[in-house]
């Protein structure tokens, strides 16, 4: 801005000087050309001497006027040329600034577009690893791998009750409705294999505690007498019938 203001000031100064010299030269030329204003046209007592001196003075004034007019024209042309040059430089600097701004914005937009395209391609052709595929259905094992201390700590009561509630009761209903139907050994073996060891151990311990609470004997009630389900074998009758069953001699 300072350089531009200085250049404008120099242009104005050259223009003013050129115009002043041009106007002064024109005035001097008009002074000699218009009759009555020149000293040669004024009447004097000395005739020949004044005529010769007036002609010399007239020629000198004309030469000075021509020099002033020429210098003024040159200064004006110089001021015009300098102003045109400065305007061209300003335009070139503005164009360079625009080009730099466009060059700065275009690569940024191209980088954003390229990043978006790469993200789209990676999301389309993304292949999960073996560990991710194997750990998707087993979040508990993943948590144990991340925190090895969890394997040492015991499960909470809420988790145990949730496991009991989450177990399906369809198998119990089937066994109650069809008591005579024998269970399939293969299905039971597969169920035992598929069940985790921890859950099976916790369930067995809880069932044992429940049965113990149910069958807890009272102090006032006498202990129940245990009777066999089937009657004892009749050994006496078999021994008595044995000699009769022998064939006669």
From Swiss-Prot:
Q: Where is the composition biased (Basic residues)?
A: 190-199
Organism domain of life: Eukaryota
Q: What is its main location?
A: membrane
Record's keyword terms, sorted: Membrane, Phosphoprotein, Transmembrane, Transmembrane helix
Q: Where in the cell is it found?
A: Membrane
Q: Where is the composition biased (Pro residues)?
A: 220-234
Amino acid composition bias (Polar residues), ranges on this chain: 99-108, 167-178
Region: Disordered, residue numbers:
95-126, 161-199, 213-249
| Residues modified as Phosphoserine | 109, 114, 178, 188
Which gene name does the record give? Answer: Tmem51
Q: How does it sit in the membrane?
A: Multi-pass membrane protein
**Is Cell cycle found in the keyword set?**
no
Origin organism of this chain?
A: Mus musculus (Mouse)
List the GO cellular component terms. Answer: membrane
Q: What is the lineage of its organism?
A: Eukaryota, Metazoa, Chordata, Craniata, Vertebrata
Q: Please give the name of this protein.
A: Transmembrane protein 51
User: Does this entry carry the keyword Transmembrane helix?
Assistant: yes
Membrane-spanning parts = 17-37, 64-84
């Amino acid at each position: 801005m300072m350089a531009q203001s200085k250049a404008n000031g120099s242009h104005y100064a050259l223009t003013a000087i050129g115009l002043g010299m041009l106007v002064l030269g024109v005035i001097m030329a008009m002074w000699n050309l218009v009759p009555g204003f020149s000293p040669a046209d004024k009447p004097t007592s000395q005739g020949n001497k004044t005529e010769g001196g007036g002609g010399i003075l007239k020629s000198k004034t004309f030469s000075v006027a021509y020099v002033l007019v020429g210098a003024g024209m040159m200064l004006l042309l110089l001021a015009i040329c300098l102003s045109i040059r400065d305007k061209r430089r300003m335009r070139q600097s503005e164009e360079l600034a625009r080009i730099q701004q466009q060059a700065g914005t275009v690569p940024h937009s191209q980088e954003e577009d390229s990043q978006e395209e790469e993200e789209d391609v990676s999301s389309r052709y993304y292949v999960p690893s073996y560990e991710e595929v194997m750990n998707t259905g087993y979040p508990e094992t993943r948590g144990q791998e991340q925190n090895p201390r969890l394997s040492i700590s015991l499960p909470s009561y809420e988790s145990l009750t949730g496991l009991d509630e989450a177990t399906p009761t369809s198998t119990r209903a089937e066994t109650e409705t069809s008591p005579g139907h024998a269970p399939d050994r293969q299905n039971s073996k597969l169920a035992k294999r598929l069940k985790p060891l921890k859950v099976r151990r916790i369930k067995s311990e809880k069932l044992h505690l429940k049965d113990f609470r149910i069958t807890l004997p009272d102090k006032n009630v006498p202990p129940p007498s245990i009777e066999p389900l089937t009657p004892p074998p009749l050994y006496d009758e078999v021994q008595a019938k044995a000699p009769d069953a022998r064939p006669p001699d």
